[in-house]
Structures are given as structure tokens and as C-alpha cells.
């Protein structure tokens, strides 16, 4: 039986710059740092970065694949300003209903998509039950 997410690993092109991004911009606690790898605690998630310099990264921008982190609604504007001030690549978000709460989509230095989201799974399911009658719900 799967008990939960163990860790998330991202391949990065420059470990030193990526450490700065996750530590200084997102506030991750660095746990381990090596020549080509680093481990963080980011909101209770074990995040691993491994440097792989010579792999193609150009197609990643076309994918919706991302990791979303929970933030409070009260912190939403502060996060947006913080990311802008630090010249983080903020992406145009998708159109969303107010019941779907708020999100900021952005990328790390290698184009991995990240999201800061004010809603919860319960919020999303409540909204979808109202707005998407074609969906089947099992909870």
C-alpha cells in the first residue's frame, strides 16, 4: 500500500543557482548539499535536486505538469510581489472561477512549473460538484 509521497526529484542544469532559488526565493530549508545534488524540506516535502547539465529542456514549457504548494489567501499578494521583485518567471495562469481559489504559476531556473495555490482539495471538489455535472465523484 502506498502511504504518501516520499520525495520529489528535479533534474537541474546548475545546482548552485538552483539551491539559491529554492532556498532564497521559496524559503526551503536546505538539508544536504553536495557537488551535484541537494536535499530540501519544502513545506514538509522532501525535495531533491540533481544536477544534469547536458539534457534537453526545451519541451518542458509545453507541459502542464507541475507541483502546487499551499499558501494562505492572506499571503497571496505578498507572494506575487516577492516573486516579481526577485525576477521569477511568472506564467500567465489559466482562467478560473473564484470558487477554484487563486494560483500563481511560475518556473524555476530550469523551466519546472510550480504553483502557489490558496485552495484545498475539498475546495476543488466542492466547486467541481457544482460546476461539472459530467464528472463522477467517488468521495
From Swiss-Prot:
The keyword Repeat appears for this protein: no
Entry GO CC: cytoplasm
SUPFAM superfamilies from the UniProt entry: Glyoxalase/Bleomycin resistance protein/Dihydroxybiphenyl dioxygenase (SSF54593)
GO biological-process terms attached to the record: response to antibiotic
Gene3D superfamilies listed in its UniProt record: 2,3-Dihydroxybiphenyl 1,2-Dioxygenase, domain 1 (3.10.180.10)
Quaternary structure and partners: Homodimer.
Protein name: Metallothiol transferase FosB
Lineage of origin: Bacteria, Bacillati, Bacillota, Bacilli, Bacillales
Amino acid at each position: 500500500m502506498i502511504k504518501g509521497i516520499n520525495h520529489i526529484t528535479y533534474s537541474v542544469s546548475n545546482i548552485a543557482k538552483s539551491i539559491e532559488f529554492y532556498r532564497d526565493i521559496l524559503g526551503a530549508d536546505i538539508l544536504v548539499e553536495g557537488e551535484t545534488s541537494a536535499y530540501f524540506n519544502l513545506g514538509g516535502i522532501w525535495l531533491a535536486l540533481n544536477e544534469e547539465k547536458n539534457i534537453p529542456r526545451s519541451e518542458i514549457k509545453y507541459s502542464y505538469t507541475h507541483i502546487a504548494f499551499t499558501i494562505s489567501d492572506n499571503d497571496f499578494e505578498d507572494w506575487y510581489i516577492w516573486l516579481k521583485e526577485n525576477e521569477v518567471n511568472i506564467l500567465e495562469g489559466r482562467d478560473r472561477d473564484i470558487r477554484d481559489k487563486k494560483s500563481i504559476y511560475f518556473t524555476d531556473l530550469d523551466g519546472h512549473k510550480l504553483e502557489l495555490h490558496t485552495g484545498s482539495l475539498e475546495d476543488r471538489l466542492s466547486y467541481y460538484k457544482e460546476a461539472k455535472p459530467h464528472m463522477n465523484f467517488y468521495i
